[in-house]
């Protein structure tokens, strides 16, 4: 979904900070909006409230491509770095956007979780690294290192303002401008050795 677009609106509402979406230069929103720790915490809390999460717009073409992959028999997971307590509204959002067949997992990718929670939909990085993937979609340069753990995993880097200047780790990472390009890359995901 278009999470960053909504975070720009929330930053404007909460702090009168006006950073247009196309000018969000860093995945780290504290840095993009020049927030102090207290402001950043308030922004993250507001951005992950159920009433906000449920209003995020779908990225055009995403649910169609993902459902096509599921229909073709591929095993698809949505793995997010969202806070563990945002699982329920995130799951509801996915269901409302016709992605009810796709499991959702929250992973503490960025070391933000302060308490151990043993919900079945949470996982540690170690648990994530024990999984196997041959394709991933990622937009966070900070998460590239996590995807690198999966041998022969082709990665579609969804082109966003905050990753446009990021150097891609290797030729398994391919920049894609939209979900049509992501789907084409998926169809041709075999990595030649």
Features from the language model and the residues they span:
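Short, acidic loop-to-helix structural element flanking the phosphoryl-transfer center
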Residues: 49-77, 84-91
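Hydrophobic anchor at the start of a short beta-strand
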Residues: 75-76, 101, 153-155
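Substrate-recognition "cap/lid" segment bordering the active-site pocket of phosphatases
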Residues: 84-137, 141-148
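Active-site neighborhood of HAD-like aspartate-dependent phosphohydrolases
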Residues: 1-42
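Acidic, Mg2+-coordinating phosphoryl-transfer loop and its flanking beta/alpha structural elements
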Residues: 135-177
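Generic beta-sheet signal
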Residues: 79, 107, 158-160
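Structural recognition of alpha->loop->beta junctions
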Residues: 96-108, 131-132, 168-191
């Amino acid at each position: 979904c278009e999470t960053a677009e909504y975070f720009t609106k929330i930053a404007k509402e909460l702090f009168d900070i006006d950073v247009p979406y196309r000018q969000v230069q860093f995945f780290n929103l504290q840095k993009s909006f020049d927030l102090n720790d207290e402001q950043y915490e308030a922004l993250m809390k507001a951005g992950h409230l159920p009433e906000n999460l449920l209003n995020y717009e779908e990225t055009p073409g995403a649910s169609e491509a993902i459902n096509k992959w599921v229909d073709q028999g591929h095993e698809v997971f949505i793995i997010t770095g969202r806070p563990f307590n945002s699982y329920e509204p995130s799951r509801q959002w996915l269901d409302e956007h016709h992605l009810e067949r796709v499991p959702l997992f929250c992973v503490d990718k960025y070391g933000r979780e302060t308490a151990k929670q043993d919900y079945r939909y949470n996982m540690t990085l170690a648990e994530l690294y024990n999984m196997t993937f041959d394709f991933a979609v990622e937009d966070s340069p900070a998460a590239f290192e996590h995807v690198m753990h999966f041998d022969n995993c082709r990665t579609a880097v969804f082109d966003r303002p905050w990753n446009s200047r990021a150097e891609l780790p290797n030729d398994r990472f391919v920049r894609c401008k939209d979900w049509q390009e992501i789907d084409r890359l998926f169809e041709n995901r075999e990595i030649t050795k």
